From Swiss-Prot:
The lineage of its organism: Viruses, Varidnaviria, Bamfordvirae, Nucleocytoviricota, Megaviricetes. Belongs to the IIV-6 010R family. Keywords: Host membrane, Membrane, Signal, Transmembrane, Transmembrane helix. The keyword Membrane applies. This is Uncharacterized protein 043R. It is found in: Host membrane.
Amino acid sequence: MVVKENFCGACLTIPLAFAGAGTAIGAEKAATIKKWSIVITIISLLLTVWFIYVKKCSTCKLRP
């Protein structure tokens, strides 16, 4: 028997943004840390908006 769990992309984007920023900080020099952190944050915000408002996430009920 296979149990399929509902997947919510919006719920996953913020933790992935923090993980990506942490990876960028650990891998890059101090001069580029801020740039990559901002880029990753903007991408994660765009993904969050996409999953919540465009895809109309019904799993987590985050949409107002």
